[in-house]
Amino acid sequence: MATPVPLVFNAPKRGMPPTHFADLNDEARIEALKELGLPKFRLNQIARHYYGRLEADPLTMTDLPEGARQEVKDALFPTLMSPLRVVETDDDTTQKTLWKLHDGTLLESVLMRYSDRSTLCISSQAGCGMACPFCATGQGGLDRNLSIGEIVDQVRNAAATMQSEGGRLSNIVFMGMGEPLANYKRVVSAVRQITQPSPAGFGISQRSVTVSTVGLAPAIRKLADEEMSVTLAVSLHTPDDELRDTLVPVNNRWPVAEVLDAARYYADKSGRRVSIEYALIRDVNDQDWRADMLGEKLHKALGSRVHVNLIPLNPTPGSKWDAAPKARQDEFVRRVIAKGVPCTVRDTKGQEIAAACGQLAAEESA
């Protein structure tokens, strides 16, 4: 029997990347410009290039003094990530990018194009410390937290890709590598930059941003108090503590009732419906009684402010589990809905290139 991966809340103390423009608040940015001999008004110019025009190279910012561009680049725009590999599938509508960071750490992001929108699945950590046994990322362990700049620049890169195609990046989901609420301050700062209008941010609606969590109950409550209107997605995967202690090890610290209570607090504070993520695993969590229990618990805890997103389990190397058959999915959905809770099956994209939920592993040789 394989040794269980340990649960890790605190990221290893490893060197963070060089300071980037996106890491700094306006006061720190102005101070940095002052040290370069540049006046305060240059901040707006640089911000409009980065967030509005999606440019990250000051050498192309022609409204800056020519002699200062290299200095601005060196001080505020270090190269945070370089693409190692880009793979596409689903008729080129899904694109997974493997990035190498300054210290050799790897991470992945996934851009999904739909007829009516485009969604970027971004990472908040390199690896993940939550140790969920059915998730490739969780089984790989946690390397380190990402910086604000490393999170934000994933968005800028994807937005630039969409712009080059004549489109626009419309949705962001923090469902890539890592537990977003375990890198709380940086994720919240990144969300604010993603959602603020130019020149302070990319101008993506807060309602078009989803922050996922395995159920760090205190952090869910803290996020509610930020008074943002992002969607909260809770990776529940089973309604009973006995199984969830195994499937989602963090449940040993914050059990189902506590997680749902925190989710209710978030729904009340934000006015938003909470999304419940449920990876359906054959003969593990797909039983009729679990569907009934799920519907009952969610209806009691969240009333009309909840929606279940059923995810057919995506295959991962060496996994002993596989997806429940379609007939089982359909019956599970029917039973949850019968308890008064909306439930749909997620349109899974990117399976063929290991870009779907639970498949991101950032392997350089893959």
From Swiss-Prot:
Active site positions, chain numbering: 108 (proton acceptor), 357 (s-methylcysteine intermediate)
Ranges where the Radical SAM core domain occurs: 114-352
EC id: 2.1.1.192
Keywords in alphabetical order: 4Fe-4S, Cytoplasm, Disulfide bond, Iron, Iron-sulfur, Metal-binding, Methyltransferase, rRNA processing, S-adenosyl-L-methionine, Transferase, tRNA processing
Cofactor needs: [4Fe-4S] cluster
InterPro entries: Aldolase_TIM, Elp3/MiaA/NifB-like_rSAM, Methyltransferase_A, RNA_MTrfase_RlmN, rRNA_lsu_MTrfase_RlmN/Cfr, rSAM
Family according to the record: Belongs to the radical SAM superfamily. RlmN family.
Note: Reaction proceeds by a ping-pong mechanism involving intermediate methylation of a conserved cysteine residue.
Protein name according to UniProt: Probable dual-specificity RNA methyltransferase RlmN
Native species: Corynebacterium glutamicum (strain ATCC 13032 / DSM 20300 / JCM 1318 / BCRC 11384 / CCUG 27702 / LMG 3730 / NBRC 12168 / NCIMB 10025 / NRRL B-2784 / 534)
